[in-house]
């Protein structure tokens, strides 16, 4: 179906729904006047003067901004962002945010990023308001068509070639804005209305990208006649590549459902499209690079197997490091890559530099605090880990329940006399967790739900609190930290010593309701340490102990499917691929309704994809 033909159906769904909702929704607040920026640029245009407005422009003027100026100034804005000049980027785009589609996209992205990073309700409202204005600006440039024209486009693809360059770019900008507005809609409130609104926006954005890909194929033969063909191509590659990549990560059962309603995702195709976009010289080429970097340095670890393409990540980052040696975002990725290589000390140094190079955007500091906290956990430097967890509790609003639980978990690893120095009450901290959980798109965050469940052991109703065993290492496992530690034999050996001490302590304690669960947790953690140390037979014994205790578990039922996942990778490392796949499928198909189920299904999907199992798709 051609784009102009499908728009009547797609936009009608959303517009009618949203118009009906406007009367019962809160009025959006005024657009934010400050924020931070993350929009595309051409990193090769280093000679261009950044931040210089076009001659003769003034805010409030009714003059039209041409496509060339919009593209150039959006590119300049990203250069400003990557140079830590966040407010300058905002001010460059602000005057024409209601006249130019690219200024609108860039400006609203700044405000949306502020909302996502701060998680303040007022910032979220500002972001939604800004993005709504941006959508209206983009709409002005989209092709206008009658119902008759829309119907005729169903019969002929010739209408694709009738779009002007400006109209084609308007579709790309509109799709990008829709996707961002959908993300904010999900975090705005937990009611079902917002969930449906967000879903409609994603559906519309996805359809626009599909049609833009069709347009790209049609105009390929005349690309020399298109002044901004490569810019349009870059937008298509970024959008379709990111959609394919993200959808492919979803568990198989969700993919089957989404395919039924018209979505599809292919990881290899998504990465190929992003790589093609990254290799070009369009304004969005850097964003294609940064998307791949995010996949390799974060997504593959948290929602994947932990097997990261570090070589590609380093290659992609190298030009950015040369051009923006003090850019916060670039330094952050650099530190992540060093950590994934096992260079924890170098990563610490780089994260600290990332904090020191700018004060304008404190949210970057919070990301670094999070990373530094985990590195100190890997090193078992508990006081330093506590320091950064405490900073997160005080300064960041992203996930208070997770931060407080982690702070309490870290303190639990310390002797009582050292905890006393901090003047913290560990039991009190654990009891705060339940009241701090939040909901997004009507759902509690899985990691927060996990923290709440674990913290219940300290509930006043339970009488004498039953102390958690190695809670910081359990959370480290949940966040796939053992994949990182596995690069360092010294860290793995030190962790094994700590786990074995906990194992011995459990054997000397009286039996309680928690004894089997605690013992199985320790065996899982011990097995992971042994696996990292290339001691597969001993690791397998630990994993089998957990599996044999399945019917005795009372609380931590997640331990069995997660242990099966680890056992599968143990078999894979020994060349028993068919056996490994069978174990993964057992974990996927035979267990449900346990903590962090969706996270494990993401990881199973990633593993089956890597192991080339057709039935897993």
Curated annotation (Swiss-Prot):
TPR repeat intervals: 328-361, 561-594
Keyword Lipid metabolism assigned: yes
Coiled-coil regions listed: none
One GO-annotated biological process of the protein: regulation of cholesterol metabolic process
Keywords for this protein: Lipid metabolism, Repeat, TPR repeat
Stored InterPro entries: Iml2/TPR_39, TPR-like_helical_dom_sf
One Pfam family from the record: Iml2-TPR_39
PANTHER family xrefs: TETRATRICOPEPTIDE REPEAT PROTEIN 39 FAMILY MEMBER (PTHR31859), TETRATRICOPEPTIDE REPEAT PROTEIN 39B (PTHR31859:SF4)
Family affiliation: Belongs to the TTC39 family.
Cited function: Regulates high density lipoprotein (HDL) cholesterol metabolism by promoting the ubiquitination and degradation of the oxysterols receptors LXR (NR1H2 and NR1H3).
Protein name as annotated: Tetratricopeptide repeat protein 39B
């Amino acid at each position: 179906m051609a784009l102009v033909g499908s728009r009547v159906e797609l936009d009608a769904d959303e517009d009618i729904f949203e118009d009906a909702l406007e009367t019962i929704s809160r009025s959006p607040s005024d657009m934010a006047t400050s924020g931070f920026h993350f929009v595309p640029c051409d990193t090769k245009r280093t000679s261009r003067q950044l931040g210089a407005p076009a001659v003769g422009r003034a805010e409030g003027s009714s003059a039209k901004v041409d496509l060339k100026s919009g593209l150039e100034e959006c590119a300049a804005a990203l250069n400003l962002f990557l140079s830590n000049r966040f407010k300058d980027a905002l001010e460059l785009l602000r005057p024409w945010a209601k006249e130019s589609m690219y200024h609108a996209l860039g400006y609203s992205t700044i405000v949306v990023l502020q909302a996502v990073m701060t998680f303040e309700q007022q910032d979220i409202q500002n972001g939604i308001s800004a993005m709504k204005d941006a959508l209206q600006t983009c709409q002005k440039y989209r092709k206008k068509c009658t119902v008759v024209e829309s119907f005729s486009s169903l019969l002929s693809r010739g209408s694709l070639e009738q779009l002007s360059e400006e109209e084609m770019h308007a579709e790309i900008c509109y799709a990008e804005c829709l996707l961002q507005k959908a993300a904010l809609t999900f975090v705005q409130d937990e009611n079902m209305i917002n969930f449906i609104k967000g879903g409609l926006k994603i559906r519309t954005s996805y359809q626009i990208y599909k049609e833009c890909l069709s347009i790209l194929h049609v105009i390929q033969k005349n690309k020399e006649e298109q002044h901004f063909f490569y810019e349009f191509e870059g937008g298509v590659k970024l959008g379709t590549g990111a959609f394919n990549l993200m959808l492919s990560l979803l568990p198989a059962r969700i993919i089957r459902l989404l395919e039924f309603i018209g979505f599809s995702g292919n990881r290899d195709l998504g990465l190929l499209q992003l790589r093609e976009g990254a290799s070009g010289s369009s304004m969005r080429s850097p964003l294609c690079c940064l998307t791949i970097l995010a996949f390799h340095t974060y997504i593959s670890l948290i929602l994947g197997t932990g097997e990261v393409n570090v070589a590609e990540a380093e290659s992609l980052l190298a030009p950015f490091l040369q051009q923006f040696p003090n850019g916060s975002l670039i330094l952050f990725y650099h530190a992540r890559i060093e950590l994934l290589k096992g260079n924890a000390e170098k990563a610490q140094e780089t994260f600290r530099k990332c904090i020191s190079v700018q004060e304008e955007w404190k949210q970057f500091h919070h990301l670094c605090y999070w990373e530094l906290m985990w590195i100190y956990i890997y090193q078992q430097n508990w006081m330093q880990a506590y320091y950064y967890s405490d900073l997160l509790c005080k300064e960041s609003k992203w996930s208070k329940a997770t931060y407080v639980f982690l702070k309490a978990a870290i303190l639990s690893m310390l002797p009582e006399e050292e905890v006393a120095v901090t003047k913290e009450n560990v039991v009190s901290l654990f009891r705060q967790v339940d009241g701090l959980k939040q909901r997004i798109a009507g759902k509690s965050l899985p990691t927060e739900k996990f923290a709440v469940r674990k913290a219940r052991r300290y509930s006043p109703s339970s009488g004498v609190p039953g102390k958690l065993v190695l809670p910081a290492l359990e959370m480290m496992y949940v966040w796939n930290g053992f994949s990182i530690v596995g690069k360092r034999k010294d860290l793995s050996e030190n962790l094994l010593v700590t786990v074995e001490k906990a194992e011995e302590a459990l054997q000397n304690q009286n039996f309680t309701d928690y004894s089997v669960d605690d013992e199985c947790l320790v065996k899982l953690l011990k097995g992971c340490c042994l696996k990292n140390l290339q001691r597969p037979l001993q690791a397998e014994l630990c994993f089998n102990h957990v599996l044999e205790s399945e019917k005795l578990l009372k609380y931590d039922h997640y331990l069995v499917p997660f242990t099966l996942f680890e056992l599968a990778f143990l078999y894979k490392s020994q060349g028993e691929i068919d056996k490994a796949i069978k174990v993964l499928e057992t974990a996927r198909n035979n267990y449900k309704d346990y903590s962090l189920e969706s996270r494990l299904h993401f990881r199973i999907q990633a593993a089956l994809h890597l192991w080339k199992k057709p039935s897993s798709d």
